[in-house]
From Swiss-Prot:
The keyword Cell wall biogenesis/degradation does not apply. The chain crosses the membrane at residues 4-24, 50-70, 72-92, 119-139, 149-169. It is a multi-pass membrane protein. Its main location: membrane. InterPro entries: YciB. It is found in: Cell inner membrane. This is Inner membrane-spanning protein YciB. It comes from Aeromonas hydrophila subsp. hydrophila (strain ATCC 7966 / DSM 30187 / BCRC 13018 / CCUG 14551 / JCM 1027 / KCTC 2358 / NCIMB 9240 / NCTC 8049). One of its GO terms (cellular component) is plasma membrane. Keywords: Cell inner membrane, Cell membrane, Membrane, Transmembrane, Transmembrane helix. It holds the Pfam family IspA. Plays a role in cell envelope biogenesis, maintenance of cell envelope integrity and membrane homeostasis. Belongs to the YciB family.
Length: 183
C-alpha cells in the first residue's frame, strides 16, 4: 500500500495534464505531494527524508512553473532530482564512506562490499543517465512526449534497473541466503 501511495502524485499529474494543461497538472502535483507528506505524518508519525526532499523540490520547481507560467522549471526538476540522487550516492560513499544502497538493503541482503559498491555506482550512473535523457526529451521533443517520458519512460527504466540490480545482487548472495529465499 505504501508503494502505491508514492505513485499517486505521478498518476494525478498525468491525469490532470491529459484533461487540462501542464500548469494545472503541476499545481495538482504540488498539492498532492503535500497531501502525501501529510498522510505519511498522520499515518506513520514519520516522514522519510527522501519524501521531504522530493516535496521541497516539487514545491520549489512546481511553484516557479505555476507562478511564471513557464514549464521550463518543472522540466528541470526531473533532471535536478536525478543528478542530486546520483551526487548523494557518490558523495556519501566516497566522501563519507557510507554506501547508501547497502544501508537501505544490507539488512536483508548479505553481499560483499565490492558488490555493494558496484550497485551504488550503477545507480549513480543510472540517475545521471535519467537526468541527461530528461534534458534531451524535455527540450527537444514536444511537451506531451516529455510528459509521457516522465510518467512512463522513467518509471519503466527504473523498474527494469531495479530488476537488474536485484538479479546482480542475488548472484552474489551467500548460498544459505539464496536457499532461504527459495523457501
Amino acid at each position: 500500500m505504501k508503494q502505491f501511495i508514492e505513485f499517486i502524485p505521478l498518476i494525478v499529474f498525468f491525469a490532470v495534464y491529459k484533461f487540462y494543461d501542464i500548469y494545472m497538472a503541476t499545481g495538482a502535483l504540488v498539492v498532492v505531494t503535500g497531501l502525501q507528506l501529510a498522510y505519511s505524518w498522520i499515518r506513520y508519525r514519520k516522514v522519510e527524508k527522501m519524501q521531504l526532499f522530493t516535496f521541497l523540490l516539487v514545491g520549489f520547481f512546481g511553484g516557479l512553473t505555476v507562478f511564471f507560467h513557464d514549464d521550463t522549471f518543472i522540466k528541470w526538476k526531473v533532471t535536478v532530482i536525478n543528478v542530486l540522487f546520483a551526487l548523494g550516492l557518490l558523495i556519501s560513499r566516497y566522501g563519507f564512506g557510507k554506501n547508501l544502497i547497502k544501508q537501505m538493503l544490507g539488512k536483508e541482503l548479505q553481499a560483499p562490499d565490492p558488490v555493494w559498491d558496484r550497485v551504488n555506482l550503477g545507480w549513480a550512473g543510472f540517475f545521471t543517465v535519467c537526468g541527461l535523457l530528461n534534458l534531451y526529451v524535455a527540450f527537444n521533443l514536444p511537451q506531451e512526449m516529455w510528459v509521457n517520458f516522465k510518467v512512463f519512460g522513467l518509471l519503466g527504466m527504473t523498474l527494469v534497473f531495479t530488476l537488474l540490480s536485484g538479479v546482480y545482487l542475488y548472484r552474489h548472495l551467500p548460498a544459505e541466503q539464496k536457499n532461504e529465499m527459495k523457501k
